From Swiss-Prot:
S-S pairs: none
Keyword Lipid biosynthesis annotated: no
Top-level taxonomy: Bacteria, Pseudomonadati, Pseudomonadota, Alphaproteobacteria, Hyphomicrobiales
Family: Belongs to the diaminopimelate epimerase family.
Protein's name in the database: Diaminopimelate epimerase
Keywords assigned by UniProt, alphabetized: Amino-acid biosynthesis, Cytoplasm, Isomerase, Lysine biosynthesis
Catalytic residue positions: 76, 224
PANTHER family assigned to the protein according to its UniProt record, in alphabetical order: DIAMINOPIMELATE EPIMERASE, DIAMINOPIMELATE EPIMERASE, CHLOROPLASTIC
GO biological process: lysine biosynthetic process via diaminopimelate
A Pfam family recorded for this sequence: DAP_epimerase
This enzyme's EC code(s): 5.1.1.7
Length: 301
């Protein structure tokens, strides 16, 4: 078996994704390889999407997801769109079904190049998110950062979109908050035994939200698809918006928007947005050493 596999550097709204082709192999991308790849500026990433042979009948692939710190992730909406684009370019297919540790994901590439991913149903039960304390209503829980009488952030909505999320509603631009300071404290708060993704969300109109996310296991990120889904669901649950909104991802590149619909007929959350290929190469999934394909020569690391 060759020591190297093909991989591509891609992004979903700037969310840095490495798509690694592990089909036909029995091994996995190791935590050591993930940490090594993230340490190199050329391959620094938010998530690795490792494509494996399907485990279940009727699925196109098993997707193993790793964070930049080497830990496993249960879901990555932006990364899933990147996988769809890569496989659509390879196979000519437009409709895909993937299996992850969080369950089944269905996705479709549209004629305009955007990609929709059915992220499944949100989970609101406190013990399934999970939380360390019991809350009958997870639309708003008791948690704050800052002085008791004047907290900077407080009373988040919490849920799981395959991974734990806390949504803090704010009245000003999410970029104006020091999320690099508060993010690690909240991600690792005792309330979240499996840690959590932390999102600041602002209502700009009844159909438009603005968000910024500290991603569990990755830190500040340009975009997070499951966080955008969680913000949209929280907005609808708390009466701030209807069930279909546009998400303006504050930290994403220009025109960084996602459309999120929390369908009423089945409670599934469908995310639609772009994916972009940047470059490709080969990588050792055990060590993380890679060679980047270039028009003139190649660069080995």
């Amino acid at each position: 078996m060759s020591n190297t596999v093909e991989f591509a550097r891609m992004n979903g709204l700037g969310n840095k994704i490495l798509v690694v082709d592990m089909r036909g192999r029995k091994d996995v991308v190791t935590a050591a390889a993930a940490i090594a790849l993230n340490a190199d500026p050329a391959t620094e990433f938010d998530q690795i999407m490792a494509i494996h042979d399907p485990k279940a009948e009727g699925t196109d692939a098993w997707i193993d997801i790793l964070n930049s710190d080497g830990t496993k992730a249960q879901a990555c909406g932006n990364g899933t769109r990147c996988v769809v684009q890569a496989l659509a370019a390879e196979t000519g297919k437009k409709v895909f079904t993937f299996q992850t540790v969080a369950g089944i994901l269905n996705a479709v590439e549209h004629e305009d190049g955007t990609i929709s991913v059915d992220m499944g149903r949100p989970v609101f039960d406190w013990d399934k998110i999970p939380l360390a304390e019991e809350f009958a209503d997870t639309r708003r829980i008791e948690l704050q950062i800052g002085p008791i009488d004047n907290p900077v952030l407080h009373s988040p909505s919490v849920m799981s979109m395959g991974n734990p999320h806390a949504i803090f509603w704010v009245d000003k631009d999410p970029m104006s908050y020091d999320l690099a300071r508060f993010g690690p404290l909240l991600e690792n708060h005792p309330m979240f035994p499996e840690r959590a993704n932390i999102t600041l969300a602002q209502v700009l109109s009844p159909t438009l939200l603005r968000t910024r996310t500290w991603e569990r296991g990755a830190g500040l990120t340009l975009a997070c698809g499951s966080a955008a889904c969680s913000a949209a669901v929280s907005a609808a649950r708390t009466g701030r918006t209807g069930r279909k909104v546009t998400i303006d991802v504050a930290s994403a590149p220009a025109s960084g928007q996602l459309t999120i619909e929390w369908r009423e007929n089945d409670d599934h959350v469908v995310m639609t947005g772009p994916a972009e290929w940047e470059w490709s190469g080969v990588v050792d999934p055990v060590t993380g050493s890679f060679t980047r394909a270039q028009e003139q020569g190649a660069q080995a690391r």
